[in-house]
Amino acid sequence: MTELTQGKAWKTLEAHTQALPHMRALFEADTKRFDNMSTSACGLFLDYSKNRANKETMSLLFSVAEDAQLESKIKAMFNGEMINTTEKRAVLHTALRAKPEQEIMLNGVNIVQEVQETQQQMELFVDAVSSGNWKGYTGKKITDIVSIGIGGSFLGPKIVSQALRPYWSKQLNCHFVANVDASSIVEKLKPLNAETTLFIMSSKSFGTQETLTNTLSAKDWFIEQGGSQADVAKHFVAVTSNVEKATEFGIDADNIFPMWDWVGGRYSLWSAIGLPIALLVGMDNFRALLSGANEMDQHFANTPLSENMPVIMGLFSLLYGNFHDAQSHVVLTYDHYLRGLPAYFQQLDMESNGKSVTLDGTEVDHSTGPVIWGGEGTNGQHAYHQLLHQGTALIPADFIMPLQSHNPLGEHHVQLASNCFGQTQALMQGRSYEEALKELAGSKLPADEKSVIAKHKVMQGNKPSNTILMDKLTPTTLGALIALYEHRTFVQGAIWQINSFDQWGVELGKTLGNDVLDRLSAENDATELDCSSNGLINMFRQKKI
C-alpha cells in the first residue's frame, strides 16, 4: 500500500464520494453554484460547476493535495530542482517562456539568458526567410517549410501552427513530416519545388531513427530535383544538440539551433523546436504565445491551491480516475482551429503519467494516467457522444470554446455555442424515465411499447464536465491554455508520486524496434525471438501472406 492511499484525506474522500447526490440535486440546492464553482485566469474562464463535487468534496481534494505536499513540489520544479529523478535532470520548460528580466539559475548559470540568445537567433532567421533575403540555391525566395521531427518535436509545432492559422504569413506554407512510412514524406514533397523549399530537422541527437530517415530522404529528393551537396546549407537547418552530426550532414553551424536536456520533447514547442510556428506567425506572435504560457506559469506558481486553475483541473481528473473508476478523459474543442489539441494533450498526459511505480520504485495501488482522447465539436455529437450520454463507462469531459470566432459567418458561431453548452447540460442533467415517458404521451403507441421506448431514451446524467472559455483564440490565450494542461498533468503526477518527465516505455520501443530492423535485413529466417515475432519478421521478408 502506498502512503498516498493510506492518508486520512484520501480515505475520507473515498467514503464521501459514495454519498454525494446526483448533480441535479447539487444544482437545485445551490442557485449560485455556477458563481461558486468557476474561476478566471490568464484570459481563460473555467466553469467546473458540472462536476460531482460540493464544498466538502473540494475541501477534501485540497487536503489530498496538501498531504502530497503539492505546493512544495511546484516550487521544486520552478526552482530547477532535479525532479526528473530517473534521468537526474531538472524540468524547466517554464524557463523557455520566462520574461527576459527573470533569473532562473541552473548549475550556476542563468538559463534565461541562454533562452533569450536562442530567441534572438530565431528572430534573425525568421526575418531573413520572411523578408525574402534568405534565398534558395537558384536565388528564389523560400515559399514552403518542411518540418521533420517526431513526438514532441512534431506534434507541438504542428498543432500550434494549425491553431494559429488566422495569424499565418501569406508568404509561407508549412508541411509537417513525422511518420517513417515513406508515403508520408513522398506525398508531402510531391507538389513542392526544391528551389523554394526549406527543411527544418528537429532531433536532439540528430539520430532519431524516423527523423533521420526522413531527413536523408528529403536530402536525396532535394539533390534529385537539381540541388547539390553544396546547396544543402541554403535549404536545411537543424534544431539539435549534436552540432557535429548536423554539420557533417551539410548544415551551416550558424543555422543550428540548440536544445537542452532540461526540456522534455513534449514540452519543447516553446524552444527552437517552435521555429516552424515562428516562421508562420512571426516572432511577435510567437513571443505572445510564450507570454500567455508565462502568465499561466505565474498563476500556477503563486496562486493558492483553492483558486489555482491547473490544480483544480488536476484534482478533478484524480477524483474520477481514483474514486469513480474513470479510465479515460475526453477533450472536446468547439473551434475548428483547435481540432488538433486532443491529440496534443493525449501525448502530453499519457506519455507523462502513463506510469506504474512511484519515485522510489514502489508499485502504485491506484490508477494513474487515463486514456486521453477527443475531437472537434460538433462532429463528435454525431458519433461518440452517444457513448458519453448512455454508455456504461464514466468519461469526464472538457469542453473548450472561444466566445468570438475568427470567421463570424451568419449564425454559425451561435449554433456552435448552443451545441457546446447544450451538451454540457445534457451530460449533467440527463433524462429520467418519467421525463421520457411524458415526452411520448402524445404518441399513439400502446402503453407497454411506450414504456419500452422510454427506457431506451433514459440518460442517467451526472456525467461530469469542465467548460473552458476564452474571449478569442489568440497566440496569448493559446499559450495559456497549453500551459494550463501542462501544469494539470504535473499536478496529477506530483500527487501520485510518479515521475511525469521520463518515458521508459517509449525508449524500450525504440530499442526493440532497432533490434527487429537488423533481423529484417538478415539473410536467414528469424528464429531467436518469440514465435509470433519470428513469424511476422519472416512474413515481411517474403513480402506476401
Curated annotation (Swiss-Prot):
InterPro entries documented for this protein: G6P_Isomerase, G6P_Isomerase_C, Phosphoglucose_isomerase_CS, SIS_dom_sf, SIS_PGI_1, SIS_PGI_2
GO biological process, one term: glucose 6-phosphate metabolic process
GO cellular component, one term: cytosol
Record pathway: Carbohydrate biosynthesis; gluconeogenesis; Carbohydrate degradation; glycolysis; D-glyceraldehyde 3-phosphate and glycerone phosphate from D-glucose: step 2/4
Subcellular location: Cytoplasm
GO molecular function, one term: monosaccharide binding
CDD domains: SIS_PGI_1, SIS_PGI_2
UniProt cross-references to SUPFAM superfamilies, sorted A to Z: SIS domain
Keywords: Cytoplasm, Gluconeogenesis, Glycolysis, Isomerase
Catalytic activity: alpha-D-glucose 6-phosphate = beta-D-fructose 6-phosphate
NCBIfam families in the record: PRK00179.1
UniProt family annotation: Belongs to the GPI family.
Protein's name according to its UniProt entry: Glucose-6-phosphate isomerase
Organism: Shewanella sediminis (strain HAW-EB3)
The encoding gene: pgi
